[in-house]
């Protein structure tokens, strides 16, 4: 029987391996995603972010890093988590269905050149799929953070979008990589804005 200590150690080991595997395939796409967001922000655009459950928390975490700061003081950057307005979420969910809680907000707030960050560990979250459709209707770019095989969202993306897919079967490991990717993108943005890299 495995001890609790062994279980915890196994989480560390698996998380490290998952990050090492992700590094092999996601460094360049992460830079592309950061550059896409920078281009949007430099053109007075905004970034909208959405997801469900832990991915909703990641969307909020990302927006907070943008509007506040990541690790260094800098100007505020326009980012909105579509997961925080309970009145909008419940009204849209009640009147149109849960699949549309993000897409209605994307249509209301999104403009051509803006960026949608859609987060779904399965790549199959119906409301994130609808948000991607709405973003494309608005001529927005999409950065999709997904897991496993990328799901339906990966298949929807255009050449001008960026897929950050973590090909791991466990949701916890995918989520851990997603927050690492979010932090890496924030760092890239800050490096360009503050250091001219």
Swiss-Prot record:
Pathway in which this enzyme or protein is active: Carbohydrate biosynthesis; D-glycero-D-manno-heptose 7-phosphate biosynthesis; D-glycero-alpha-D-manno-heptose 7-phosphate and D-glycero-beta-D-manno-heptose 7-phosphate from sedoheptulose 7-phosphate: step 1/1
Entry binding sites for substrate: 52-54, 65, 94-95, 120-122, 125, 175
Record key words, sorted: Carbohydrate metabolism, Cytoplasm, Isomerase, Metal-binding, Zinc
Residues bound to Zn(2+): 61, 65, 175, 183
UniProt keyword annotation of Cell wall biogenesis/degradation present: no
NCBIfam families: gmhA, PRK13936.1
Subunit: Homotetramer.
Protein name: Phosphoheptose isomerase
Organism, scientific name: Neisseria gonorrhoeae (strain ATCC 700825 / FA 1090)
